[in-house]
Amino acid sequence: MLLLPVPAQTICHLFCTVIDNYGDLGVCWRLARHLADEHALAVTLWVDDLVSFQRLAPDIDSAQSSQMLGKLCIRHWQGDAVDATPGDLVIEGFACSLPASYIRAMAARSSAPVWINLEYLSAEAWVEGCHGLSSVHPGTGLIKHFWF
């Protein structure tokens, strides 16, 4: 199992693009709540479709660009416009593409964040060999870790 070091006061930004059937959003929402509740991380869940999110979490106000839901900060993710200091831990839900401006801000940090690409669950044989692999971003040198 790959264990990545994270700071004691960890700020986590989790990005989710809603594709279909709420599966991606459901997994990201559960993961965000788990990280906040069980590991005391300060989690911001960036979601591109708050109307769909409201169907899973009726307390979401789809008209608000930023809101708290329990311990989570929920932010409406609209294209490349991400106005936030990158977290210590950055998770791409299911290979969604992080905004270029956010990646540049990640690279500008004094210490690089832990960057995880959360991938789909699979029982295929190749997955075990890919879990935990890393990839260097060609423009920034940041390292992304793949988590299956």
Where are these regions (language model features)?
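Glycosyltransferase specificity loop/lid
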Residues: 2-89, 93-96
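Hydrophobic helix-cap positions at the C-terminus of alpha-helices
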Residues: 35, 106-109
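Short beta->alpha connector loops
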Residues: 95-98, 121-123
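Short, aromatic/basic amphipathic alpha-helical patches
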Residues: 55-66, 102-106, 129-136
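Active-site-proximal region of nucleotide-activated glycan assembly enzymes
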Residues: 108-148
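Short helix/loop capping segments that flank catalytic or ligand/cofactor-binding pockets
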Residues: 23, 99-101, 126
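Internal, well-ordered alpha-helical segments in soluble enzyme and binding-protein domains
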Residues: 98, 102, 144-147
